[in-house]
Amino acid sequence: MGQTATTPLSLTLDHWKDVERTAHNQSVEVRKRRWVTFCSAEWPTFNVGWPRDGTFNPDIITQVKIKVFSPGPHGHPDQVPYIVTWEALAVDPPPWVKPFVHPKPPLLLPPSAPSLPPEPPLSTPPQSSLYPALTSPLNTKPRPQVLPDSGGPLIDLLTEDPPPYRDPGPPSPDGKGDSGEVAPTEGAPDSSPMVSRLRGRREPPVADSTTSQAFPLRLGGNGQFQYWPFSSSDLYNWKNNNPSFSEDPGKLTALIESVLLTHQPTWDDCQQLLGTLLTGEEKQRVLLEARKAVRGEDGRPTQLPNDINDAFPLERPDWDYNTQRGRNHLVHYRQLLLAGLQNAGRSPTNLAKVKGITQGPNESPSAFLERLKEAYRRYTPYDPEDPGQETNVSMSFIWQSAPDIGRKLERLEDLKNKTLGDLVREAEKIFNKRETPEEREERVRRETEEKEERRRAEDERREKERDRRRHREMSKLLATVVSGQRQDRQGGERRRPQLDHDQCAYCKEKGHWARDCPKKPRGPRGPRPQASLLTLDD
C-alpha cells in the first residue's frame, strides 16, 4: 500500500540533474516545467503513440522528432532541445533508464536473410545484445545495404578535397591497405551517441570486399562517427524559405540554432552554413561578435589572441570529432557562434521601437510578451531575461497591453511586489474572461435598446412636465382674471359711503330714497353688464 507506479516521466524528474547533464552534452538547455508540459500535454497530441507518462521507445521518439522538426508553421522549434535530450537518454541510457529502454530488434536482418548464403556454424554460442551496433561481425554483412546508394550524389566528392576530420587510422600491420576496412586506433576513447549528422552508430567492419568503401563519408566501422555533409537542397530551402539576417535576425538565428543543435556540424560545415545564409558583411559581423564572446579562465571576456584563436579560430582547425577533445572543441565553437549570431542581430538602441509594440485586439498576453521581449533583444542592449530588467519589462507589459487589460493590471493590489509571471497570469485571466464577438454584439444590441427605451421615457416625462406646467400657468392666469373682476365689484361696493336710513343714495340728501330722488334722470334702464369668464379653450 502507498506505492506509486514509476513512469519514464517521473523517472526523469527524480534524476533531473542527470537530465540536465545530458542536455548540456547536447549543447542545449531544458527546463523542468516545460519538460513536463511537452511530455504530458504536447507530444500526446501528435498522434504518434506518445503516452502522457513518456516513453523510451526509440521508434516513438523518432516520430515525435519528425513532428517537432517539421518545416514551416507545423514545426515546433521550441521543443527541439527537449526531444533531442529525450532521444539522447534513450540512445545512450544512464543506469536508471536502462530498465525502461525497449530492446531494439534486429529489423534489418530478416529482409536480407534470404539473399545471403547459408552461414557456417559458429564456434561459440550466439550472444544476444540490446544494441545491434555491438553484434558480432559475422552477423552484420547485410548492414552496408542500409547506407545510401553508392551511385548517389556523393560520387561528386571524389573530385573534391577530402571532408574534414577524417581519421584514416594506422596502416594494417601486414602492410595491406584495404579501402573497405579501417583499423581502429588503439586506446581511442569510446564515442557517445549523438544526433543527426554525427550519428554514433557503431558498425562493425564489413568483410565483403565487393562493397565499395572508397568514400570517407561512409566510414562507420569500429565505433567511428559517420559524417554526412549538408545537401545542396537543404541549403537552398533554408536560404529561400527564410528572411535575410538583416530583415529578421531573430528568425534566421532560430533556424541556425536548430541546425546547430540537431545536425552537430563541423567547423567546415559551419562556414558553409554561414556563407550560404549570410552576406559577406553579415558573416564578418557574426564572427567578430562571436570572438568577443570568448571567455578566459576567470569567466570574463578575454582579449588574449591565443585564447580567442584556440576557442574560435578563423582558419580550419585540427579538431577530430572522433575524439572527446575534438567534440568538446566543436561544442564550444557552436556555442560561441550562436552567441555571435544573437549579438550581431541586435539593432542600435531604439526605445521608440519597443514602445511601439502594443497588444493586438485578439492577441494573448503570452504572445504579446514574447514580441515585447524580442523587441528588447533587437532594439536595446538589455536582456529581458535578466532579473535586473524585470521591472522595466513589467512596466512595458502593463502600459502597452490592451486598454482593458492594462487598466485592471494598474489597479492590482501590491503591484510593486508582483513579478512578471504574476502579471502574465493575471492578464491571462482577464483575457480569458473577455466576451466573445457574439456576446459583444448581443450586449451592444441590448444596450442600444435600453438607451432607446430610456430616451423615450425621458421624452414622455418631459412632455408630461410641459403639459403640467402649461395647465398650471393657465390656471393661475384664469384665477387672476376672475379674482380681478371680483375685486372690482367688491371694491365698488366698498367705495359707496354709509347711508342713513332716510338718506338718498343718489344725491345723498335726506328725506327721500334714490328711487324717489328728483335729481335722478327718468329714462329707460340699460342692461347690466355681465362679467366674462375665460375657459381653458380660450
UniProtKB/Swiss-Prot annotation:
Origin superkingdom: Viruses
CCHC-type zinc finger locations on the chain: 502-519
Region annotation (Interaction with host UBE2I) ranges: 430-435
MF (Gene Ontology): RNA binding; structural constituent of virion; zinc ion binding
UniProt keyword list: Capsid protein, Coiled coil, Host cell membrane, Host cytoplasm, Host endosome, Host membrane, Host-virus interaction, Lipoprotein, Membrane, Metal-binding, Myristate, Phosphoprotein, RNA-binding, Ubl conjugation, Viral budding, Viral budding via the host ESCRT complexes, Viral matrix protein, Viral nucleoprotein, Viral release from host cell, Virion, Zinc, Zinc-finger
Entry-linked PROSITE patterns: ZF_CCHC
Stretches for region Interaction with host PIAS4: 345-393
GO cellular component, one term: viral nucleocapsid
Modification after translation, per record: RNA-binding phosphoprotein p12 is phosphorylated on serine residues.
Motif (LYPX(n)L motif): 130-134
Biased segments, Basic and acidic residues type: 434-466, 486-519
Alphabetical list of InterPro entries matching this protein: G_retro_matrix, G_retro_matrix_sf, Gag_p12, Gag_P30, Retrov_capsid_N, Retroviral_Gag-Pol_poly, Retrovr_matrix, Znf_CCHC
Gene Ontology biological process terms, A to Z: viral budding via host ESCRT complex
Pfam families per the UniProt record, alphabetical: Gag_MA (PF01140), Gag_p12 (PF01141), Gag_p30 (PF02093), zf-CCHC (PF00098)
Name of protein: Gag polyprotein
Organism of origin: Friend murine leukemia virus (isolate PVC-211) (FrMLV)
Organism placement in taxonomy: Viruses, Riboviria, Pararnavirae, Artverviricota, Revtraviricetes
Gene (UniProt): gag
